[in-house]
Amino acid sequence: MTPTHITSLAFPVFTQGLALGLGLIVAIGAQNAFVLRQGLRREQVATVVLFCALADALLIAAGVLGMAQALGEHPGVARALAVVGAIFLALYGWQALRRARHANALNATAGATGLGQGAALAQAAAFTLLNPHVYLDTVLLVGSIGAQQPAAMRGWFIAGASGASLFWFALLGYGARWLAPWFARPRAWQVLDGLIGVTMFLLASLLLRHALAGI
């Protein structure tokens, strides 16, 4: 198999992981507000960004590889999970489109006390690992979708989904001073939610088609 052929196969898988990762992580939430706040105050930005991105990458890899091994022995369960995943993505997309109809904004100004590296890591860990949605999103949802990919392509899917986390957290942390006024505008989040909704519906249709093709 030539490098060009490998790239042609890997790029759509990488892009799917990237789109899924961005669709799930771009949301109004405590973790994003924390990263943005650290960026605004220029406190422990590298520490917080790297921790959040690395934690996501490890959870995504564990989810994809673990689910792949489990589902490889039960193809029927794999198809069922693909259908469930498609339904979840469609519902997630529908919720995003609903949010796009209402004004909202991200508040990154709460908390005025400066943080040392240890305290910043502790808070980043709490916002990341004590949030039950992180396990639903990264381990179960991303893991089950990534496990549907051919074995040789799973690394590309993991790279895409992990790259989305690194890109988003770096954008929040290092672009905070430019992004904060934009994120404070409800209209910006309405546009983002609209794009997320469309992306989730597209991914749901791809996943459902994959599930039905295996029947």
Where are the predicted features?
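Alpha-helical multi-pass membrane helix bundles of inner-membrane/thylakoid proteins
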Residues: T2-F11, A78-A80, L91-V134, P181-L192, ...
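Final/C-terminal transmembrane alpha-helix of multipass membrane proteins
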Residues: L192-A211
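Hydrophobic alpha-helical transmembrane segments of multi-pass membrane transport proteins
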Residues: I158-A176
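Hydrophobic/aromatic residues within the transmembrane alpha-helices of Major Facilitator Superfamily
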Residues: L18, L22, V26, A57, ...
